Amino acid sequence: ASKKGSKIHYVPPYRGETRLQLAGWLGLAVDRLKDYVSRDLIRAIVSMREIKQPEEIAQLEEVAQTGYRMHTAAMAMCREGLTERDVAAELDRIAAAGGGRTSFRSIVSQHGETLHNLSYDGRLENGRLLLIDAGAENAMGYASDHTRTLPVGGRFTEKQREIYDIVLAANARGQDLARPGVTYQSVHLEAMRVIAEGLTQLGLMRGDPAEAVAAGAAALFMPHGLGHQMGLDVHDMEGLGEKYVGYDDATTRSTQFGLGALRMGKTLKAGHVVTVEPGIYFIPALIEKWEREHIHSSFINFPKLRSYFDFGGIRLEDDILITATGNRLVGKHRPPIAPAEVEAAMTR
């Protein structure tokens, strides 16, 4: 085809051996492959894979049940004296027993403020929060992805419950708004407004919540996006490039801190499967940096935040299918999420 002058279409190769093979065929240096990928082919693949067919939805429903068992088992075993590694090992065991494996390396951490903390060295301590971001992958390769945050010892403190309720409200708001014709970027911003409003009521933020979100101030507490597509990859098709998977000509990626980390921003369509995963994190180094540099000081009550430096973080993540009229949860059973449900699951 190359000798005939025909255009050769390929997508960004993922595996190392494929990169070497393709570079050899095309006579290119490996680091030049990215310069000649076919945007037409990428867009065609995205358009087919992003709309989940009934057979795919059935696979996602199946693996979601394994994810449910993983999280409820973690809740039942979460107690002082165990290690984060003990919980992670049980998640691995249940995923394997379900016929597959975990869909990514599980996050099991009492330092929820570290967004992708893959260390399992901590020993569980009463009064602390344990953030568990974990999912399963089934034999067909389809993935689940849920996050729950648990109070070690089985009961939320009043301070923890205040923050938890804000995150839960943001999760609910995101699910209320997600439907065909709505950009997920707008859903993200509304979830952020709920977070800013709740933190303002607690005195941790000040001013108008909508203005704080527009300015990017609320991203101090949630420096990531509301969600991403799911399917055969837990971050579905991410290797093809988020600007094609999560964005399009009508919706471009923001450069603003926090909002720019949103992986899925474009208009939702029936058949999309996306995560809804708001969070609130108290990251001492980031808070101190913003305070030192007077970043958004009109919106943030820095002195009051010092009493939250040992808080950690809370994230609550569900997987939803966009339907013709709105959305629904993927999976027959939702991992416990209301505070009373979580506490009950931890005392069985």
State each model region's role.
Residues A1-R348:
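Active-site neighborhoods and metal-handling regions in enzymes and metal-associated proteins
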